[in-house]
């Protein structure tokens, strides 16, 4: 399994960064990178289509090393499984980051729609429901 290098950058779009800031402001997530990782995991779990997600117009958020090790491993494993399922080859760290980024960028709009008009506490409760439902798979 290919790994993401710890010094590689996580690079969301400005639109994604805006929603990440909103989630942090609502105290849903303490760190932007955690919200971005959750969006990626959500999209992976939902089997979202990432074929139209562009990797252009990105801005540095933080390095991969700031992710908790367990989260990093889960994202890498998810990327490996989904790449294999879709006939893609992960050849190096950047290819793993690219697929994780695409899933995060696909997941954020879906979460934004799902959480529209909800308070931070309501969003946190929904996150618990998502995690509980995912654990039953």
Identify the residue ranges that each predicted region occupies.
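Charged, low-complexity intrinsically disordered terminal regions and linker tails
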Residues: 1-11, 15-19, 37, 49-137
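Short, basic alpha-helical nucleic acid-contact segments in DNA-binding proteins
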Residues: 43-49
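Recognition helix of helix-turn-helix/homeodomain-like DNA-binding domains
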Residues: 23
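Short amphipathic alpha-helical segments
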Residues: 30-40
């Amino acid at each position: 399994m290919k790994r993401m290098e710890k010094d590689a950058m996580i690079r969301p779009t400005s639109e994604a960064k805006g929603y990440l800031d909103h989630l942090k402001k609502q105290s849903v997530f303490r760190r932007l990178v955690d919200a971005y990782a959750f969006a990626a995991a959500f999209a992976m779990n939902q089997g979202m289509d990432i074929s139209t997600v562009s990797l252009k117009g990105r801005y540095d958020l933080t390095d991969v090393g700031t992710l908790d090790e367990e989260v990093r491993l889960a994202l890498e494993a998810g990327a490996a499984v989904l790449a294999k399922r879709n006939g893609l080859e992960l050849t190096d760290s950047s290819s793993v980051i690219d697929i994780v980024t695409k899933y995060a960028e696909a997941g954020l709009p879906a979460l934004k729609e799902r959480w529209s008009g909800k308070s931070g506490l309501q969003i946190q409760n929904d996150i618990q429901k998502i995690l509980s439902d995912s654990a039953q798979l």
